[in-house]
């Protein structure tokens, strides 16, 4: 465990939550966005935003999106990743059955949310903001405390956009720790 790295990940998580809320409030919609936490040449932690991939709307676009993110991971070498989007989801507890033949956007039990999903070397976090659309055309966001979770065991996380860093955790984490330890000595 490294306190400097853990603090950087906590800041990254807060920055992405704040960005998502501000962006949605100002624009009324949220495209698919990905941000990475990595180190720059000076060994400072920085956030690198992936190019906006908002044009990817369809079910068929998802594999292309994931492939692009995985390619970016190889270049950026992040220790944390944020996936932010506006989405239709079906809220459920882990042990509840869900009909995977029905897309969330077509389910009668769907919820419209802004989702901020954070993945790091040691755990995942999920923050959901219910989108409330008023008859005036205005929107408001309400944080969903029941389904949001700051620290989720990565083995409990599933979904199309989950565990994208999985193949690189140990390698990138070890590189970052070595770099931090060299700078502290």
Language-model regions: role of each:
Residues 66-185:
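Low-complexity intrinsically disordered segments
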Residues 1-64:
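N-terminal domain-onset segments
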